[in-house]
Amino acid sequence: MNKSPLWLRSLLWVVAVFLMLAAVVYQRATGPTHPARGDFEVAGQSYAYKLIRSDWSIKTNEAARVVLPDPGGDKVSDAVLVFRRLRTDDPFTRQTLRRENHQGKPLLVGALPAQPAAGKLEYHIEVTTSDGRSVRIPSQGEVIIRFKDHVPGWVLWPHVVMMFFSVLIGMRAGLGALFAPWRMRLWAWIALAGMTLGGMCLGPLVQKYAFGAYWTGFPFGGDWTDNKMLVMWLSWVVACAAIGLRPSKREVISRALVVAAGIAMMVAFLIPHSMGGSELDYSKVDQGIDPARAIETGRQ
């Protein structure tokens, strides 16, 4: 197979890097660890907020710190954090926010009680201005925070790095199959190796540390993150098994399978992270069941 021109190979790497970075940004923006952001207005002035949506469980944490910019005592007479356990009929707990000063910035601060792994709370903040006006933050709906057990960095960071490395190489393999098939096989096999290590080996370890189970996708549960990892990995297994290690007489089929695997990878990363992920069923906890045995998946 003829070697592709340098300019074309370089261009394909640039496009692959762009697609990988787009996947990183999208996964972070749609994932459960991304803070809820917005603005609220008091006395004609706008304030940007960033509300926490992920924190450590009761194993290593007492409370999740909720922080809001403080417009000042002359503008805000009261601010209340309102929360309860998700998917329960619990009455909402109301907690007055306290005023703090952090590095010269006035803040309104509250604390959400830490939950067992996969436990979730829903909350919002009610601000009463000095002129008696009520401001709800966010203006509609609730912010949902999920708690998880601590994941060691030696497991988490290699998993994250390996997954996005696999996306980079997978995108390059798919683009190469379309426009410059020279070394297509090398990139396809490297992508499969990266997903095997980062997704199918380290991924379950991250899940085990965070929520107590190695695998919560098919056939054991409805975790979309595990399921999309499985589909993505299998698509590359099929592609690599078909293309082998050397060029064949049916290169059109080989190239088509690598392109299909690349498309499957891109589609998988368009699915928001942690959809249908681990969630504590409080109805079981209230029946006396150990929280570690009361975790469900597949809920929306």
Language-model regions, residue ranges each:
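Glycan-association/targeting regions that enable binding to alpha-glucans and other polysaccharides
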Residues: 2-182, 194, 198, 247, ...
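Non-cytosolic membrane-interface motifs at loop->transmembrane helix junctions
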Residues: 152-158, 213-226
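Gly/Pro-rich turn-and-neighbor structural signature
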Residues: 183-187
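Small-polar-interrupted transmembrane alpha-helices in polytopic inner-membrane proteins
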Residues: 190-209
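Loop-to-transmembrane-helix entry motif
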Residues: 194, 225-231
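Juxtamembrane "helix-exit" motif on the non-cytosolic side of transmembrane helices
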Residues: 204-215, 274-275
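Interfacial non-cytosolic loop connecting adjacent transmembrane helices
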Residues: 210-221, 284-292
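Generic detector of multi-pass transmembrane helix bundles and their immediately adjacent loops
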Residues: 229-300
